[in-house]
Design a protein with these regions (language model features):
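Nucleic-acid endo/exonuclease domains
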Residues: 1-136
């Protein structure tokens, strides 16, 4: 069902914390040289989108900057296996540094997902309640 062990492990944390979520349940169209579609890994009941990454390659980083510029209403956050991993073999910038630079929230999967990310306050977001669609 899940495309990676990291996504599976993230789902286990969400289930353990009794957080309602949908897996790959939304299509966001965006333009990047040509029209593309993004399917988030997890959409939490509170509307937060979790994107789980073992590797965070250049194309993924570009994609998320394009998506955010075209869909600023969505709160996309990263769950990394290792946020301290370097973007490039001999580089200094880490995944965490990149997120800080571009103001994306992130966490380390092994440390669990921050509790404030999981809170719903009894409300379901519009993004969570709608059916999977191709509309952005």
């Amino acid at each position: 069902k899940y495309k990676s062990n990291s996504e599976y492990n993230c789902s286990c944390i969400l289930k353990k914390n009794k957080v309602s979520f949908k897996y790959e349940n939304l299509n966001l169209n965006y333009k990047w040289e040509e029209s593309k579609r993004y399917i988030p890994d997890f959409i939490l009941e509170n509307g937060i989108i979790l994107e789980v990454k073992g590797r965070f390659v250049l194309d993924d980083r570009k994609k998320h900057l394009f998506i955010r510029s075209q869909h600023p209403q969505y709160d996309i956050r990263f769950v990394f296996d290792n946020p301290n991993r370097k973007l490039y073999k001999n580089g200094k910038m880490t995944y965490a540094d990149w997120c800080d630079k571009y103001e994306f929230k992130y966490c380390k999967l092994g440390d669990g997902i921050p509790e404030d990310w999981l809170e719903t306050n009894g409300k379901r977001s519009e993004i969570y309640t709608r059916r999977r669609s191709t509309k952005g």
